[in-house]
C-alpha cells in the first residue's frame, strides 16, 4: 500500500498507521512493516503502532528515530508492506531457553537492533534473556566485536593509545579531568569518550561540557586527539558502538546491568576508539556496583580476559568506593575542584591519590616510567603544571576558553547548611543519599547545583558544625534537596539519633 509520509518528533523507532490502513495491509499492533521511500527506493523496517485519531487514513507517521535510517521528507510517497518475523526472534527465544549464541546469531541480533528491525519489546526480551541466563566469555566477545562493527571506528598510526574507565557508583568522580591531561602530557594518546549522568549527579561528559563542547564526530575526535594528545568527549554524540547505546537505553527502565553486557559495553567503546591499553577503575564498598574486594577481583579477571581476546592490554585497579572522591558533588563544584588541583592548589587527598594512581598505572603499562613509579611521575606532571597546560590545550581544541580558571564556575545562590546533631567522629557517608540530594538540588541540569561535603569518615565534628552545604539555582529545588537530606541521613556521626520509635498506646 502506498501512503503519504508524516513525521512525529519522538526518538523511539515506530510507524503510526491508521487502523483502517493497518487492516488493509494485514498488520496488528507490534507487527513490523517495511517502508520504502518511492523517490530513492531505500527500504527500512519498523514496528507498527495503530491509531484511530493520531494518523488519518492514507497517511503514515514515522518517528524521527525511524527516519534516521530512511532519510525521507514529510510529504514523500512511501510503500508499506507487512514484513516477516526476523530470524533474531528465534535466537532470542533460544537464549530464553538457556541456549548459547553463536557469532552469526549475535551478528544478526545486533544488525536487526541497529537497523530498527527489532521492536522495543523484542530488544527488552533479548536483554532480559541475557540477564537471566548470562553470557559466557565467547558470547561476550561476539557481542563486543559486533557492537564495534555496528558503528564508526577510529584507527591511530601512533601507538600506544590509552583509555581509562570507571565502573562507577561513586559520587564526585571527576578524576578523568586530571587523568586525561596527565596521560596526554606524558606524550601518549588518550581519546576519552564519556557518558552523561543517568542516575548520578554529573557524568564526565556533563562536567567537561562546562569547560568546552563535547559533541564531535569520530573523525573530529581522531584529529583533535592527534593534535592535542587527548580529548574528553560525549560518546553519545558519535556513531561509535551505537548498538551499545541502544541496549543501555532499554536496560535503564529495568534497572538491570547484565554482567556480560556490561563487559561488552566497556570494551566495545575502547576497541572502537583504537585503544590498545586500558586502565579500569573498580570501586568497591557500600553504595557501589561492586560490593566487596572478592567480587572486584572476579570482575577484573573477566575484563583482563576479554581484553586479551580483543588485543587490548587491560589492568584493573580495585579502589575504595565507600565515600565520595573529593568533597564536591555537582557540575560546577566538581569542575572547580579538579581545575584547582591542576592549578597547584591544595585539594582533597582522595581526589589526588586516586587520580595519580590511575594515571600512574597507564604510565607504567606503556613504559613511560618504571614499575611502581607511575603514581609519583603522574603527581610530578601535575605539580610542574604540565597537566594544567595540557588540559587547557584540550579545552581550546574542543572549542572552550583556554584561559579558564577554577574560580570561574559559580554555584547556586540558594544554600542550606546541614549541621551535625551531636559531637563525634563521622562513621560513614551514604553515597546514594548524597547523589539524591545533589540531583534534587538540580544537578546535573543546573550547573551551579550540588553540594560540598565538609566532613568525611574518620573526621571529628562538633554539634552545630556543618556536615554539608547544599547549593541550588532555584528556591524550590533547594526545598526538595533539604527534604531529601532530612530523611536520608547522608552523613552519620557516632551517637546520633537516627529514629525515635514510640508505642501506639
UniProtKB/Swiss-Prot annotation:
GO term, biological process aspect, one: AMP catabolic process
EC number annotated for this UniProt entry: 2.4.2.57
Keyword Iron-sulfur among UniProt keywords: no
GO cellular component, one term: cytosol
Listed GO MF terms: 1,4-alpha-oligoglucan phosphorylase activity; AMP binding; pentosyltransferase activity
Chain sites annotated for binding AMP: 169, 195-200, 204, 265, 289
Alphabetized UniProt keyword annotations: Glycosyltransferase, Transferase
Catalysis performed (reactions): AMP + phosphate = alpha-D-ribose 1,5-bisphosphate + adenine; CMP + phosphate = cytosine + alpha-D-ribose 1,5-bisphosphate; UMP + phosphate = alpha-D-ribose 1,5-bisphosphate + uracil
Keyword Glycosyltransferase part of the UniProt annotation: yes
Active site, renumbered: 257
UniProt xrefs under Gene3D superfamilies: 1.20.970.50, 2.40.40.20, Nucleoside phosphorylase/phosphoribosyltransferase catalytic domain, Pyrimidine nucleoside phosphorylase-like, C-terminal domain
Family assignment from sequence similarity: Belongs to the thymidine/pyrimidine-nucleoside phosphorylase family. Type 2 subfamily.
UniProt cross-references to HAMAP family, sorted A to Z: AMP_phosphorylase (MF_02132)
Its biological purpose: Catalyzes the conversion of AMP and phosphate to adenine and ribose 1,5-bisphosphate (R15P). Exhibits phosphorylase activity toward CMP and UMP in addition to AMP. Functions in an archaeal AMP degradation pathway, together with R15P isomerase and RubisCO.
Protein name: AMP phosphorylase
